[in-house]
Amino acid sequence: MSKPVSERSVRLLDSMSPILHFLNDSIWSSRRHETGICDFTIGNPHEMPPRELVEAYSRWIEPRNEHWFAYKMNETGPRDVLEGSLRQWRNIPFEAEDIFLTNGAIAALAVVLGTIVDPGDEVIFISPPWFQYEGMILNAGGIPVRIRLLPETFDLDLGAIDEAIGPKTRAVIINSPQNPTGRIFPSEVLKDLAGMLESKSRESGRTVYLISDEAYSRIVFEGKTFPSPVAFYHESFLVYTYGKVLLAPGERIGFIALPPTMSERVQIRKALVGVQMMNGWSFPNALLQYALGDIDKIGIDIAHLQRKRDRLYTALTAAGYEALLPEGTFYMLVRSPWRDDEAFIELLARHDIFCIPGSTMDIPGYFRICFTPGDDTVERSLAGFELALRQAAEMGEARS
């Protein structure tokens, strides 16, 4: 009897099984809609969206002509907006024709991988990773190669990356600021990475591309400068989404940008558009393209987000937790008092506190806090966090 689904879909499901189990079969999944819980799991909004965002949508929803809601691809107006924005934010002279509008960063990553990866090509990604990198590489026909961040510092392990690059390597995916650690990789490390990729490309006679996932690049704290990996390596793809800085992940708009230094840009441009069309029509809806000039100027209150970060970090470390202070993103990585992080997540749930277990992100023994909830939720959670830690100590080392 024939199988109802493809082998590829089976592999994809297997790569996603830890997070799918959490989303569909955990205590959180059964209680997520309860009022009064402290939900620190996913980067969803917990307060009303920025008024400016609602006004932008209202301003552009009214049709100006009969073609207002016609098919949209990489339209000239929003591309021009992004050319100016990228020159401001990245200080790189991107050109409008090298910018490709997508319905979010997930679509952008899928389009880039579909453009450059052939079956059997290897794609390196960094662990602990965002949940979907491995599955997206598999979906493109590639072979995922996992490289862990250096322990304790959570910096890029350039030695391990160097050793992993071989004749089949097609790309390296870097996410900075990094989910889930909040780490911003420093310029010196990115320069060394660029030099390595240039050397490896020369040796093999085949370009090793850098895919720079910069979804959180506008969410940085304490006035830090975000160094874009694209600034250091010619053969790079910049991937971005507005869903994070707007805290509106249900409104899907993002882009791919090619730096002017990239070789073979003309051929890559054509291929990207073709893959966009075949990859489920990976272009943003008309309304979002019209509104992009307004959307690009809007963002959540980063200072407020930093205050919530600081409140959680100070309270948790004072209670006895070990936590990594994030330099960017809206996530904080905290060490579980038990090696079995899923068991500790269940203990937190008894106090109506919900976080993501590190085992879903290939970092067992930790858990991730998303600090997008409001101040009242943060304050209500602190006593429960402290009590759960005391209970874990009282229950002994059975789970540690």
What are these regions (language model features)?
Residues R79, S212, R309-D310, L382:
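Short amphipathic alpha-helical/adjacent loop interface patches that line ligand
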Residues A286-G293, L305-L316, A323-R335, M361, ...:
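Conserved glycine-rich beta-strand-loop-beta hairpin in the small C-terminal domain of fold type I
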Residues H234-Q306, L389, G396:
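Conserved core segment of the aminotransferase class I/II
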Residues D162, E346-I356, T360-S400:
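PLP-dependent enzyme catalytic core of the Aspartate aminotransferase-like
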Residues V5-G104, V111, I295-G299, Q391-S400:
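N-terminal small-domain helix-loop-helix segment of the aminotransferase-like
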Residues N279-G280, P284, Q306, M332-H351, ...:
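Accessory recognition modules or surfaces
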Residues E62, E66-G205, S217-Y233, F237, ...:
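Conserved core of the PLP fold type I
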